[in-house]
């Protein structure tokens, strides 16, 4: 149940389909939010948990609307929870980070914050002035990890990083808890047979690394498990723990942070 708050963003990633040049800004009104929430709740089982994905563009740019959506949904149904997909830039603001951390409603209802980060040194993820965002993103990840937020790093494999996605995830897994790294594949950007071959080769490298216990990165068939509408969604997925154990989980929207991995938020400077 995805709520798109805006197509605006504080980054200008070259591969993004939302914030295209000449495309007018689009922002949900309060009425739009109520209509969207009501539409979801009308078709949901009143006795089951309802999950909303807070999305954009960049949803934190419309935080008042995000907050309104969460409170409105909660006023209609107590058994609701949320996850948010964000580039995380706004969490560099200590004031905003504190605002989220100090609110017990957010802490209980915001199950996960998925921070998109598609490459170490990726020049396709830039600010509007052309400046690279990677230095900021490393600070974002350290800030949310230190603050104790429930977060995951969402890496989308696409044409811009297909040549180095394996190296990226390996490096990130050595700095941050690898159980927090999830991956998805933007298949529409990987049209060339060579790109598909590189994807397959990267998967094989990870499997071999696991056999040799050379790295510490979980493998989830390399697909994101967040969106129920995803064409690659499967009922069960296999996760490899940092001890070499294999566990199969049911795949459902907004799956929680993988609980069987060691929590080791060792942030290397």
Regions found by a protein language model. Give the residues of each.
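Canonical Radical SAM [4Fe-4S] cluster-binding loop centered on the CxxxCxxC motif
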Residues: 1-35
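Cysteine/selenocysteine-centered motifs that mediate thiol-based redox chemistry or coordinate metal-sulfur cofactors
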Residues: 269
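Residue-level structural signal for beta-strand termini and adjacent loop
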Residues: 65, 251-254
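Short acidic/His/Gly/Ser-rich catalytic and metal-binding motifs that mark active-site loops
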Residues: 11-15, 121-124, 192-193
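Radical SAM enzyme [4Fe-4S]-AdoMet core and its adjacent flexible, acidic
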Residues: 125-245, 249, 256, 261-262
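Active-site neighborhood of divalent metal-dependent phosphoester/pyrophosphate hydrolases
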Residues: 56-58
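Radical SAM/AdoMet-radical enzyme domain recognition
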Residues: 34-53, 62-188
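Short, contiguous acidic/charged loop-to-helix segments that flank catalytic cores in large enzymes
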Residues: 23, 264-266
């Amino acid at each position: 149940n995805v709520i798109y708050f805006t197509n605006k963003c504080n980054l200008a990633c070259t591969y993004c389909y939302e914030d295209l040049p000449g495309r007018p800004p689009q922002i949900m009104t309060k009425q739009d939010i109520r209509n969207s929430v009501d539409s979801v709740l009308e078709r949901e089982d009143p006795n089951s948990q309802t999950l909303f994905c807070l999305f954009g563009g960049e949803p934190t740019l419309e935080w008042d609307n995000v907050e309104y959506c969460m409170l409105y949904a909660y006023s209609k149904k107590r058994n609701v929870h949320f996850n948010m997909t964000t580039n995380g830039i706004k969490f560099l603001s200590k004031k905003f980070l504190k605002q989220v951390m100090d609110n017990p409603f957010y802490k209980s209802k915001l199950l996960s914050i998925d921070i998109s980060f598609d490459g170490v040194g990726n020049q396709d993820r830039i600010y509007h002035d052309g400046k690279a965002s990677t230095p900021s993103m490393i600070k974002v990840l350290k800030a949310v990890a230190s603050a104790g937020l429930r977060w995951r790093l969402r890496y989308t494999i696409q044409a811009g990083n297909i040549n180095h996605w394996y190296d990226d995830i390996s490096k990130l897994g050595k700095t941050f808890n690898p159980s927090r790294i999830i991956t998805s594949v933007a298949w529409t950007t990987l049209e060339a047979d060579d790109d598909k071959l590189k994807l397959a080769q990267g998967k094989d490298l990870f499997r071999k690394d696991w056999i040799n216990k050379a790295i510490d990165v979980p493998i989830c068939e390399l697909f994101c498990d967040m969106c129920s509408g995803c064409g690659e969604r499967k009922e069960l997925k296999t996760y490899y723990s940092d001890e070499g154990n294999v566990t199969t989980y049911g795949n459902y929207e907004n799956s929680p942070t993988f609980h069987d991995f060691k929590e080791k938020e060792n942030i290397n400077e």
